């Protein structure tokens, strides 16, 4: 029996992990802790084998006025949670970082994350995650620390870029043919990965991803097909998009950012869902 504490109550990722683990009550005992409650520090972590930390401010387009808040939540709160876990005997701490610690994707040029790629975040969201990693890894204890740097995560009722792409794919008659490659991670595959990490009591830095990267236009085609919508791919918009490549929304949709498969080829067999299956599940809005 492993006791797992999810720090971040009712979070998107935490809820999927909780639901999966609770399918085997003889193997896992799961609890959630609301870190928005100022009294969270009174909660004892003693007796828990794993703390899965998902509390944090999500990647959006925040303005400068939110900068301090991002560091308070994404850096300092994460560090204090890990420190408390280490002091109270937790065996494994899993921290959700992000691929954004490497910087954003680039339009028009290939960008591959390898083991030599330095951490060069270009937003304070990315830097807040980087600083959290540094502080958490500096904790001197026997607690195993797991840092996850996933690419864009999507799934049923997800937030961020995917819902925008889905709406576009369902309604627009046209979409640019501008080529790009981007690593993605279906929430169902992430859940399987986290289960493996817990079961095998792993530690280290991991970059899980789907089996293959995907081009945005191919993703749009799959989504449109799920809804019986015909969409035509045209090149007329490509020059304009290239001129707008520094715009955040263009970079997010058409930027190139892939993870070297060598960094994700763990012998863990966690990619349970293919891209096609993941799109079917996501667009149906169902569960895993």
Model-derived regions: residue spans:
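Glycine/proline-rich active-site loop of Rossmann-fold NAD(P)-dependent oxidoreductases
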Residues: 130, 142, 153-164, 196-206, ...
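Mid/C-terminal beta-alpha module of Rossmann-like enzyme folds, strongest
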Residues: 193-250, 279-288
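N-terminal Rossmann NAD(P)H-binding glycine-rich loop of SDR-like oxidoreductase domains
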Residues: 3-22
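Conserved Rossmann-fold NAD(P)-dependent oxidoreductase catalytic core, especially the SDR/UDP-sugar
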Residues: 80-124, 146
